[in-house]
Amino acid sequence: MHIARSRGASTVMQAVLAFAFGMGWLGAGLAWLFISMHDYGGMPAPLAALALILFAAYLSVYPTLASAIAWRWCADRGPLRLALGLAGAWTLAELARGWVFTGFPWLALGYAQIDGPLTGLAPLAGVFALGGAAIGVASLCASALV
């Protein structure tokens, strides 16, 4: 996001990049669903692959919206505001992903931080806030490098 900001990308281009990120992240993380649907559920392989792609595309809407909201409201106000906006929008998007239409809270970013330096936040704020904090720290680090 910070690289796109430094190059003057539009909101639509930023959303496309965020959707591609979501498809890669969630598509790889949910690959086990193909095995469940195909090997154990008896679903034909092309249909199982299509179901996985469509499910990953649906779930990718959440990080896309978070990124687009942060981009639209915060990108022109400096890297600190962008980092805070992205952290807040990401946290709300992960909460929504875990709740809307009965939710699918798997692959929340906060779970990856269980043995990391942000672990102390987990009992205080929960896994979704931990993911938001990780996004905020990563965003600040990225802005320092760009």
Residue positions per predicted region:
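Membrane-embedded alpha-helical bundles of multi-pass enzymes
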Residues: 1-146
